[in-house]
Amino acid sequence: MSHSQYKCQVQGKESYIDNQFVIFSQSYLMNQVHIYNKEKGHTTKNRVNLLELGCYNGRVMHFMTQQMIFVNYTGVDVTPQYLAHSPVARRKDVTLLCEDVTKGLSIADGSQDMIISSEVLEHINPEELPGVMRTLYDKLKKGGRCCVAFPMNTRDKMFHNLEKEKGLGHVNFPVYEDFIELCENIGFTLHHYDSGFSLKSSFRTPRYGKDPLYDKLRDRLGSPAARAVWMTITDEHTGGGYFTFDKL
């Protein structure tokens, strides 16, 4: 597994890039947890067992508690320094594990109701990706759900170039069609797919003056935030995506 030397946060000082990632990627995943809770009837007394792969310091759990979304949370990250500064490490409903998913996970098979992961799979070498997705499938309960987000390409268009993103630690951009096929061959069933924000994508937003909604977003939020919002709400492929699968 390739470990990125790129840091969006240094000593607690958040960058603008990191804030965009939290708002437009991790917020999506948190909302999917909320939706799953409602669908399955989970409450604070009947909590979802949630695994987050590439959890950084467990901040998604921290954000969820602020939104009154309570789960039994297991966060996995390969970098011990991140876990050492977790804001949720002392919570009784939190388990933090420093493990490399390409070498397997110590979590019991069939123990998790839901798995989420954002901006992780592009750091995993392509030959290791099938094994990683098989591991995630095995950890899910029957009826469980997996939601993963990452920068991607399609068979028709290359949104990302590895040579241009080596500095971010990226080693693989899964192809949309191939990734769905891979996961379905493992046993997953695609629940839905949504386009999403991706930092280095070659996706082009509408030219100013061509779309009133985009113009309004740009006038009020500025170009970077308008671009991120647009990539999140469009039905076009953007070079970033959220894949949600069920284990039926």
Give the label of every model feature segment:
Residues V148-H170:
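Short, glycine-/aromatic-enriched active-site segment of Class I SAM-dependent methyltransferases
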Residues V171-G187:
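Short alpha-helix
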Residues M1-A108, M114, S118, P130-M133, ...:
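Conserved N-terminal segment of class I S-adenosyl-L-methionine
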Residues H192-L248:
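A C-terminal cap/extension of S-adenosyl-L-methionine-dependent methyltransferases
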Residues E119-H123:
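Short catalytic micro-motifs in class I SAM-dependent methyltransferases
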Residues P130-K142:
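A short glycine-rich, Lys/Arg-flanked "PGG" loop and its adjoining helix->strand segment in the class I
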Residues P87-V88, K157-L162, S202-Y208:
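Short aromatic-enriched loop/helix-cap "lid" or pocket-rim segments at secondary-structure transitions
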